[in-house]
Curated annotation (Swiss-Prot):
Motif (L/FRRG motif): 261-265
Description of how the protein assembles with itself and partners: Component of the PI(3,5)P2 regulatory complex.
Species of the source: Pichia angusta
Source species, domain of life: Eukaryota
Residue spans of biased composition, Acidic residues class: 339-361
Record family assignment: Belongs to the WD repeat PROPPIN family.
One GO-annotated biological process of the protein: autophagy
Annotated spans, Disordered: 307-402
Signal peptide annotation: none
The entry's keywords: Autophagy, Endosome, Membrane, Protein transport, Repeat, Transport, Vacuole, WD repeat
Subcellular location: Preautophagosomal structure membrane; Vacuole membrane; Endosome membrane
Low complexity composition-biased segments: 374-386
Name the record gives this protein: Autophagy-related protein 18
Gene from which the chain derives: ATG18
Length: 525
């Protein structure tokens, strides 16, 4: 292993310290609070609700484009980059009741309409054909062109306002949590006195907002949902449960699980999910301050299928079949679905306990990254590794280096190789931890613990200049030009925090690894 470049480590650490000091210096004033922040449908703008009004910002380049002092605002949603806004107040003024929705034209400075509902509004979603309003137990669907009420849906209690609407008018789907249902428990050994059923809270209803008909129920997780997101084209659904260790991606049309990723080894709160506009990546932010980027490639899809098949075989071989001794007892246990097998991941998520959060970065496995391969997938090292292969290794942010991360990287690389050889001999409880699909890239947000975050992804690849020394790792690579800037083609990963900051990171779409902080801005300017 090459020794760390001290110049690179010093420069990267200094950059990280500058970011942290910027956050400290731009903390909000006593009476300034952010009640709401979100991206618009194509991640080109940010809308923010404050205790004294609301503002709209452009993302590329970042800058304020509209502001209004209008009392305490709890929801501000945009219709792409148009002048149409949906506003809901916090209730501190009579005209800004949390039960009242205002549709505003910012260009004309007029209120198009106001709608009052029987309860507090928890979420508002828009696309070019529909406006959806979510209360705790009711969904209202409107024609956005004339604000005519088209349909209402009674739902189970949804206090967290969990709902997703596709930006696409062609695949105009709505996703929301399904009511609880009883499901078979594949880990319960059936006896005459046992109850082989458990309550399932993690299903998602897919509703066609154009035909106003439900289309399917996707069995996403066994435990309650924490986050859901639909892709820009409405073809993919991403989900995370309240345990927060497994991220899944489904086909909206068929309900088939296409991808499964392991975010980490112990539970955490997932705050947001987002697809890249080209469906190449899905991004997850959590309470660990780390944002994980997962690649939706061919190998990741194959690994998901392979993992499901392996767990199905293991479960079938190790779980006693009660039909052999009691043919009249619970015949459903004769076959365990692959989805139930994969729930072993969630049932055994907290085996490692409260380990250090730095380990959750999972230090990317340094394997060759040809197009279509994942840095987190199992690979083999060749003694004749070429310079081209080295250039394909994941980028490393030297400021995030630690002994824990290096040990983690080595142990995961060895562990996954061992899993390939020994996986068939391990019980599901332990083989589930060796999930082949891990994150392709990650970034660390310079924020306090438990700071809520929302993520977005840029729609194009940018040519960005970054310090060459920032990513150098080879001690022999120090030259007189180490401080020069180098041009990198990067996808922009954007993060908004509840502390009031906007961050822009650069993701190398081919190499993955650690994302580079490119820009940060206070939302209290």
């Amino acid at each position: 292993m090459a020794s760390p470049n001290p110049l690179a480590f010093e420069a990267a650490t200094a950059a990280h310290e500058v970011a942290a000091s910027y956050v400290t210096e731009h903390k909000p004033r006593k009476n300034d609070n952010i009640n709401f922040a979100n991206f618009n449908q194509d991640f080109s703008c940010v809308s923010v609700g404050y205790s004294n009004g609301y503002k709209i910002y452009n993302c590329e380049p970042f800058g304020q484009c509209y502001s209004k002092s209008d009392g305490s605002i709890g929801i501000v949603e945009m219709l792409f980059s148009s002048s149409l806004l949906a506003i809901v107040g916090m209730g501190e003024q009579h005209s800004l009741s949390p039960r009242r929705l205002k549709i505003i034209n910012t260009k004309r400075q007029t209120t198009i309409c106001e709608l009052t509902f029987p309860g507090a509004i928890l979420a508002v979603k828009l696309n070019r054909e529909r406006l959806v309003v979510l209360l705790e137990e009711t969904i209202y669907i409107y024609d956005i062109n004339n604000m005519r009420l088209l349909h209402t849906i009674e739902t189970p209690s949804n206090p967290n306002g969990l709902i997703a609407l596709s930006p696409s008018s062609e695949n105009n789907y709505l996703a929301y949590p399904s009511p609880q249902k009883l499901a078979p428990n594949p880990q319960t050994e059936v006896t005459l006195h046992s109850n082989p059923q458990t309550v399932r809270n993690g299903d998602v209803i897919i509703f066609d907002a154009k035909t106003l008909q439900p289309t399917s129920v996707i069995e996403a997780h066994r435990t309650s949902l924490a986050a859901i997101a639909l892709s820009k084209d409405g073809l993919l659904l991403a989900t995370a449960s309240d345990k927060g260790t497994i991220i899944r991606v489904f086909s909206v049309a068929t309900g088939i699980k296409l991808y499964q990723f392991r975010r980490g080894t112990y539970p955490t709160k997932i705050y947001s999910l987002a697809f890249s506009p080209d469906n190449r990546f899905v991004i997850a932010s959590s309470a660990t301050e780390t944002v994980h980027i997962f690649r939706l490639g061919e190998e990741e899809a194959a690994n998901t299928i392979k993992s499901a098949n392996k767990k199905a075989r293991l479960t079938k071989a190790q779980v006693p079949n009660p039909l052999e001794t009691s043919p009249d007892i619970y015949p459903h246990n004769q076959h365990t679905s692959s989805d139930e097998d994969e729930e072993l991941n969630e049932d055994e998520e907290d085996l490692d306990g409260d380990e250090d959060e730095d380990l959750e970065d999972d230090a990317h496995v340094p394997v060759s990254l040809q197009r279509g391969r994942s840095s987190s997938s199992t690979g083999s090292f060749h003694s004749s590794e070429s310079m081209t292969d080295k250039l394909k290794e994941p980028l490393v942010d030297n400021s995030r280096k630690s002994v824990a991360r290096m040990l983690r990287r080595t142990s995961q690389s060895l562990g996954r190789k061992a899993a390939e050889k020994m996986g068939t001999y391990l019980p599901p409880k332990f083989s589930s931890i060796l999930e082949p699909n891990r994150h392709f890239a990650s970034l660390k947000v310079p924020a306090s613990k438990e700071t809520k975050t929302v993520v977005g992804v840029g729609s194009k690849i940018w040519d960005d200049l970054i310090p060459s020394v920032y990513l150098k790792d080879d001690a022999n690579s120090i030259t007189e030009t180490s401080e020069d800037l180098v041009n990198k083609k990067l996808v922009h990963i954007m993060v908004i925090t509840s502390e009031g900051f906007f961050y822009k990171f650069g993701l190398d779409p081919e190499r993955g690894g650690d994302c580079v902080l490119l820009h940060q801005q206070s939302l209290f300017g």
